[in-house]
Amino acid sequence: MSLTTLKLATKKKDLCLRAVKGHFATSHSHMNYYIDITMQKSRLSEAKSIAHEIVSSYRSNTIVDTVLCLDGTEVIGTCIADELTKEDFANMNAHQTIYIVTPEYTSGSQILFRDNVVPMIASKHVLIFAASVTTGLTAKAAAEAVRYYGGKVA
């Protein structure tokens, strides 16, 4: 079965949405459209554009020490950290830098952090960034893991 991708323009010239109409099922939900963000997760110019838009919500009121990247969003997470540490941003963390981390998962899909990553979570303000939040279960699990390891969700 061939799927047709719809390319939708946005207000940003270097950023577009790619959507596929159909029936898509996960273990917890069913959807009629799939928004493909593969390019945004992989292409630096699009990742930078997304990060710039996202950071505008966090510029003056949120402390971010660590970006927790879910669903392969490390490129965007790195761009978010870059935006948050630019000179025109009032960075509230002590080292003027931001950690970018990804979790590991147990065989039961529980999120865990190895001993070498725990210091980047414990006592830190952690921004959780996910490619998709359909039911909220993954976001909830990530927030619980951050709190379990002694971090605060930003």
Residue ranges and their predicted role:
Residues M1-A154:
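PRPP-associated nucleotide enzymes
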